[in-house]
Amino acid sequence: MAGKARVHELAKELGVTSKEVLARLSEQGEFVKSASSTVEAPVARRLRESFGGGKSAPAKGSDTGAAKGVAKAPQKVPGVSPAAKAPDRSLDAALDKAVGNGAPAPVPAPAPAPTPAPAPAPAQPADSGVAPPAATPAAPAASAAPAPPKAPLPGQRPAPTPGKPAAPQAPHPGMAPGARPGPVPKPGVRTPRVGNNPFSSAQPVDRPIPRPQAPRPGAPRPGAPRPGGASPGNMPPRPGGASGGPRPPRTGAPRPGGGRPGGPGGGRSDGGGGNYRGGGGGVGAAPGGGFRGRPGGGGGGGRPGQRGGAAGAFGRPGGAPRRGRKSKRAKRAEYENMQAPVVGGVRLPHGNGETIRLARGASLSDFADKINANPAALVQALFNLGEMVTATQSVGDETLELLGSEMNYNVQVVSPEDEDRELLESFDLTYGEDSGDESELQTRPPVVTVMGHVDHGKTRLLDTIRKANVREGEAGGITQHIGAYQVSVDHDGTERLITFIDTPGHEAFTAMRARGAKATDIAILVVAADDGVMPQTVEAINHAQAADVPIVVAVNKIDKEGADPAKIRGQLTEYGLVAEDFGGDTMFVDISAKQGTNIEALEEAVLLTADAALDLRANPDMEAQGVAIEAHLDRGRGPVATVLVQRGTLRVGDSVVAGDAYGRVRRMVDEHGEDVEEALPSRPVQVIGFTSVPGAGDNFLVVDEDRIARQIADRRSARKRNALAARSRKRISLEDLDSALKETSQLNLILKGDNAGTVEALEEALMGIEVDDEVALRVIDRGVGGITETNVNLASASDAIIIGFNVRAEGKATELANREGVEIRYYSVIYQAIDEIEKALRGMLKPIYEEVELGRAEIRALFRSSKVGLIAGCMISSGVVRRNAKARLLRDNIVVVENLSIHSLRREKDDVTEVREGFECGMTLGYSDLKEGDFIESYELVQKDRS
């Protein structure tokens, strides 16, 4: 046949079935899908050679078609060369040896004689209709029926009947030892070829013999009857299946099977249809070795519950299983789910103690992404534990750690400092270290922070040093922001630079003082000689000592009456500041900032301390790093940040990032208002060019590109929002649900200030006001700069009050506020704002009502009226009873009903407002369950002032 040929045409040409051709092609390594598929000419030639050239088609029988499905003779057997075209005596010897080695064969059952095929075939000691011997028995099979079975239909295998084991037959003379006698061969029956029938258990010997496998757990013992009573042999015959030809026994050693003989999956002895739990038993198993088995090498039998494709259907060698075998990962996941902990009634993933790092303010969705879990399951678990949290809501650190411990995870909440360091490391950036070696470090000026109690003369001291007047520009005469200045002093004939940072002394500016202490090298503690040590003085000492900063004490106002510098030295001894006069190491200088007394001595003390105790060096050749000590929004210049360069040199045009703000340095201005092209270490400058206002105390650093600065700022902004949401979220448990659902008063505020530090201090001071649980204070927005229309619209939508600190509203914003009815309050001194907000919160408290008893009345008679209902005739036994007053009904000194109201009150025929003790009256209560002898107790609620 020239060109391509179809499988069924080749089968017709060779005189075999299409199924046999497909099986032979599969043995040769050719994958052919169906009988209508085509094969190449070389493949067809090899196929014809494997069948020994063309063979005549068998004649169709008149009464049966059994000969049509008879298997062909085997191609390869042990000891026979592949070129052999027909089996010889060596085949019989090999088969007898295999049978003699202990391969049991079932007892032959009578079957109708098939019509002999006209083609001659060698005689084989087998009978048509007899099942071939079992291939993989675990024990000698004994499954013969006690009675002769019913003869099967033509082309159908006989069904073995479960019951008593059949008696062994006597062997014929000349048979090999251990071999079973077979029926007399019938002439004309075609000999099946080994490996040609996909349903045959006898396969080519060149396939590797599978290793013995242990019986499958739970499988029936070998030789036992099939569960359910139905035998696989009763199933209808397969299309084209061999039924009339004899089947030789499987060559090779028997395989131990699990379940039934025929394979680990409990296959039949003939390897054909009817295998209950199919599957070839391991590597190199017979194709189609089971009704539902996998063709070819299966992996140890079918998985319990898995249904494989039917072998040999429509001429196919066997289909793949309907569902793929589960991988080890899927099985492991199922096992872990079985072992998963149950938290709050919800099954959650089970960890192995690994560490999960989460940022502060992370949500349950973030946690679920880390552990590959469903966020809804975590939400349900927390809800069942009494914690109501959404999947995207920020969760506190304790909740995350508790939930992680329940699932065997070690949750670590990363601190903001560590998270920021990791963020910078992801961009190959480091903060806080000088690059280069020791030879590149140069001496820098000391940074000095002036600290102390309010009104003790800190700003006046700086004014005297700078020969300026900053104090008069501060509202209320108190410093409300940080000022940074650099002055030049003459020390031993050498010009030296000193950077001064002025911090507020008011109690509301604790955060500012802490930032000033962290950014400084030396702290000057100003104490008034006539006032002594005050609370903010102690707080300043604590900040300086916590930052490990040396302290120089300036005893101010020594020119005033009542000044006692010795007393100050004695008081500060309690806090570890021992003067040099008393044998300590702290330098005390008595000064008068107003008169300018001993200012040079104070500067000299600062320089001596810096030279003796500190190593003030930095690398000016690296990219600049420092801290933003203050920031504000200027109307004409935009965001302006006062930065202190600590390392490197800051130049105009550098890309900088400070906290969640970024930008490019457009302009730098010093404390005198003059432009600066570059700022060396320890130099404070005002930087113009940020896209937003940086936070006071944020670290700034120079990066290579604007893109990197924007990415760092965006990530910091997202982290800041999450942390703020986690901090502001109020935890509501199920026990507190009733109280949480009750109506509560809340004062919403929008804060606007002239600089970031003032806004931060004002917010912390306002949030620290404690009035009562019934009222709450909420800051819904905060910002630096004037009050805009956007602020007014937000306040109108949220019923908020706008607080302006040293800022005013724009013209259109004022008109919009008047039109929308939004209240704007302006303040210039911080404690005035705190006092007024506290009074407003107290005014929002619900009033307290106190019950005052008025009198009691006894019901003597009852009268019914069609107009007003039931009328109670009463005698006032004590006090007075008023109309429209509250009342309760008592019966046998037990309260029957509360919160009644006296609708009408009559004395004889006149309506009266009240009736006093000893008089009779009639009254209606709007209540019908009244009895004679009941008492009516009248009272009223009087509002009580709340402190």
Curated annotation (Swiss-Prot):
Sites where the protein binds GTP: 452-459, 502-506, 556-559
Compositional bias ranges of the Low complexity kind: 131-145
G3: region residues: 502-505
Record-given protein name: Translation initiation factor IF-2
Region of interest: G5: 592-594
Family: Belongs to the TRAFAC class translation factor GTPase superfamily. Classic translation factor GTPase family. IF-2 subfamily.
Chain residue ranges for the region called G1: 452-459
Compositional bias of kind Gly residues: 255-318
Keywords: Cytoplasm, GTP-binding, Initiation factor, Nucleotide-binding, Protein biosynthesis
Residue numbers spanned by region G4: 556-559
Purpose: One of the essential components for the initiation of protein synthesis. Protects formylmethionyl-tRNA from spontaneous hydrolysis and promotes its binding to the 30S ribosomal subunits. Also involved in the hydrolysis of GTP during the formation of the 70S ribosomal complex.
Region (G2): 477-481
Keyword presence, Protein biosynthesis: yes
Gene: infB
GO CC entries: cytosol
Start-end of Basic and acidic residues biased regions: 86-95
Chief location of this protein within or outside the cell: cytoplasm
Gene3D superfamilies linked to this entry: 1.10.10.2480, P-loop containing nucleotide triphosphate hydrolases (3.40.50.300), Translation factors (2.40.30.10), Translation initiation factor IF- 2, domain 3 (3.40.50.10050)
Region (Disordered): 47-332
Domain tr-type G residues, every copy: 443-614
SUPFAM superfamilies documented for this protein: Initiation factor IF2/eIF5b, domain 3 (SSF52156), P-loop containing nucleoside triphosphate hydrolases (SSF52540), Translation proteins (SSF50447)
PANTHER family per record: TR-TYPE G DOMAIN-CONTAINING PROTEIN, TRANSLATION INITIATION FACTOR IF-2-RELATED
Biased composition (Basic residues): 322-331
Pfam families (UniProt xref): EF-G_D2, GTP_EFTU, IF-2, IF2_N
InterPro entries tied to this protein: EF-G-like_DII, IF2_II, IF2_N, P-loop_NTPase, Small_GTP-bd, T_Tr_GTP-bd_dom, TF_IF2_bacterial-like, TIF_IF2
UniProt-annotated location(s): Cytoplasm
